[in-house]
A protein has these predicted regions:
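Enzyme catalytic cores with a strong preference for nitrogen-chemistry domains
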Residues: 1-347, 365-374, 401, 406
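ATP/NTP-dependent adenylation/nucleotidyl-transfer catalytic domains that generate, transfer
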Residues: 6-7, 23, 161-163, 220, ...
Length: 637
């Protein structure tokens, strides 16, 4: 439960129809196994203490009493377990029978939640035996305890307030307006569904989509426990299709007719963060009653999958679709700006590196979209002290194969003159030595754009902006930045996508060589072999780490300790802990110190959910203090 993680499971034990003693034993044994495995929330199927398929036996008072006795045994067993459990049983209230979810924790019956929507179609005849949930919440004496009874019940953990649970039962989810919608608006972050959904052709896919979509719509975690082996097969079969979804993502699943057990860690902090950002998620807690309960805080071992590259889809087809869409978005944004500005040219500084190559590809797509010749793209290479033959050659070949106008402007003489103007020693390889080159290049591009009636297309990417790895008013500045919302890890895949998609072998070859070239601003002289000496990732750290950190800082607002923990899970097989922590500290230091550059960014299209535009998703003062984050980092080591 530390860092907002909660280990939870859905369980579908084998049962015997109407054998409450056996079913109770199965339930208790499953609870004990789950608790021993560190689970703190277990959800069982609908009417699991009796079996869903009892039919008119539900009217038998002996069965009702046996179910209540079974619940009492579950309560007694739960007293020794650090676990909340939800079990299903029939409950008679004032001469009417209700299909209920019983919420159990530490020997206490926290609440009874009756089913709202009773199916009475096809193979289902629930209205024959049961009544729909009554309005409001009342107190009952049941299983030897005073207990709240009703649908408008929330169960909140005192030690972990973001763990707020509510329940619904099977058909409730299939209704046009499920009770879980109201539960979530009232504050529930976890929805438990006790279900007995029989299996028919195509139903598993529909069920999976339904649970996933509801978790996305409600910004919650949704646990769905399905009836399974042992239910009557007189007219139906039940598949124990258990599901756990979180904000639209399937975290765990027990395949139909499988083991009937799904287990994972819920990230409740993530759900709370999502709701904080969503202004359309308006709380509605009228008439709801909150029941507090206690569970000990414990550190949960993470077994859930954490992507090492959160910006990049793991599936090949999904990744290709993502790359194609991003290219289309970038090109459309640039095309609109070119048309609006009546620009005659799109001027790009081309270095032979990844970012400028992507910007050039985008500009070519934009011109084609506008029905204009690719020659209207003016690509300019400006070699200086650190330019290598490899990058210079790749820049020219790329421009030739794309059919753009290519121009070379050596800037060495201009930079030397500028050094003399400001008294910079030519042998002093400091920040001034580097930034002078970047600013001279921007000056050349801006003036070329003026002379040709064009606009300067920016090449800097999201990762560089997060780290401030750009010269202020140098490569930091342009007239429209097409890459500003694309992280470096994704830039690579987009360029590779273009390489794979083209039928031009020469173009493919040069793009692949650019992908193989070390990332560098080439502002310091090459080594004795004429190769790149200044490699970005050896100076600021691996971009796959910084992109990982950036994603969780901006997307969910997680703190350093939780991000470090996630990084160890996702990237621990590639980097030792001390390296992960070193670059995490470096990320925070640079992120806070470099905000002043992000406060005056050029326009550029929003691409994903993580962006640093000062006019859009990220508004941060340039002089904010990082002491809070630094203190948390210091505690990590």
């Amino acid at each position: 439960m530390i860092h907002g993680f909660l280990k939870a499971c859905t369980v579908s034990p084998a049962l015997r129809v109407a054998d409450c003693a056996f079913n109770t034993q199965q339930t208790i044994a499953a609870m004990q196994r789950a608790a021993a495995d560190g689970v703190q929330l277990a959800v069982f199927p609908e009417l699991g203490l009796t079996g869903y398929t009892c039919g008119d036996l539900f009217f038998q008072q002996s069965l009702q009493r046996a179910a209540a006795k079974g619940l009492a045994a579950v309560l007694e067993a739960s007293a020794a377990l650090d676990l909340m459990a939800l079990v299903g049983l029939p409950v008679a209230v004032d001469g009417k029978l209700y299909n209920c979810a019983a919420v159990v924790c530490h020997g206490k019956l926290l609440g009874l939640v009756p089913k709202t929507y009773l199916p009475n179609y096809g193979e289902f005849y629930e209205k024959r035996q049961f009544n729909p949930a009554p309005a409001g919440v009342r107190t009952l004496h049941f299983a030897g305890q005073e207990v709240p009874f009703g649908t408008k019940l929330l169960f909140r953990c005192a030690e972990m307030p973001e763990f707020c649970l509510a329940a619904e039962v099977c058909e409730d989810l299939w209704a046009p307006l499920p009770p879980s919608t109201h539960h979530a608006l009232a504050g529930a972050t976890v929805i438990a569904n006790l279900s007995a959904s029989d299996e028919t052709i195509g139903k598993a896919d529909y069920r999976r989509a339904l649970v996933s979509q509801q978790s996305a719509r409600l910004l919650c975690t949704y646990l769905y426990a399905d009836a399974g082996h042992g239910e009557s097969t007189t007219d139906m079969v039940f598949a124990a299709h258990d599901l756990i979804c979180e904000n639209g993502s399937l975290l765990a699943e027990s395949r139909p007719f499988g083991p009937g057990y799904a287990c994972t860690e819920l990230d409740l902090g993530r759900m709370v963060s999502e709701r904080c950002r969503s202004t359309t998620f308006q709380p509605e807690s009228e008439d709801y009653q909150t029941v507090m309960f206690h569970l000990p805080l414990r550190e949960v071992e993470l077994t859930r999958y954490v992507s090492p590259a959160p910006f990049v889809p793991a599936d090949d087809n999904a990744r290709a679709e993502r790359c194609e869409l991003i290219l289309a978005m970038q090109a459309d944004g640039l095309a609109k700006r070119i048309a609006h500005a009546h620009a005659k040219t799109a001027v790009i500084g081309i270095s032979g590196g990844l970012d400028s190559s992507l910007a050039l590809l985008v500009a070519v797509h934009a011109m084609k979209q506008l029905g204009r010749p690719t020659q209207d793209v003016l690509a300019v290479t400006m070699p200086c002290f650190g330019t290598t033959h490899r990058t210079r050659s790749n820049a020219e070949i790329l421009c030739e194969e794309l059919g753009v106008t290519f121009q070379e402007i050596p800037i060495t003489r201009t930079v030397h003159s500028h050094f003399a103007d400001i008294g910079q020693g030519e042998a002093v390889l400091d920040v001034t030595y580097e930034n002078c080159q970047a600013r001279v290049r921007t000056l050349e591009l801006m003036d070329l754009a003026n002379r040709t009636g064009g606009l300067v297309v920016g090449t800097g990417d999201l990762s560089e902006l997060a780290l401030g790895w750009a010269t202020y008013n140098g490569d930091h500045m342009s007239m429209y930045g097409v890459n500003a919302d694309v992280p470096k890890t994704l830039v690579r895949h987009i360029v590779r996508y273009e390489a794979d998609a083209t039928e031009n072998e020469a173009l493919r070859a040069v793009l692949l060589d650019i992908l193989d070239t070390p990332v560098s601003p080439e502002l310091l002289p090459a080594n004795e072999n004429g190769e790149i000496a200044q490699q970005t990732e050896s100076l600021v750290g691996p971009y796959e780490l910084h992109d990982f950190y950036l994603y969780y800082v901006l997307r969910f607002g997680f703190g350093p300790a939780k991000i470090y923990r996630l990084a160890r899970r996702a990237l621990g097989d590639r980097y030792p802990d001390d390296v992960l922590l070193h670059w995490l500290k470096n990320f925070y230091r640079r992120f806070f110190a470099q905000q002043f550059k992000r406060s005056c960014l050029p326009d550029g299209p929003k691409i994903g959910s993580v962006t640093l535009s000062p006019r859009g998703d990220w508004r941060m003062p340039s002089d904010a203090c990082a002491a809070v984050w630094q203190a948390e980092l210091d505690q990590l080591g």
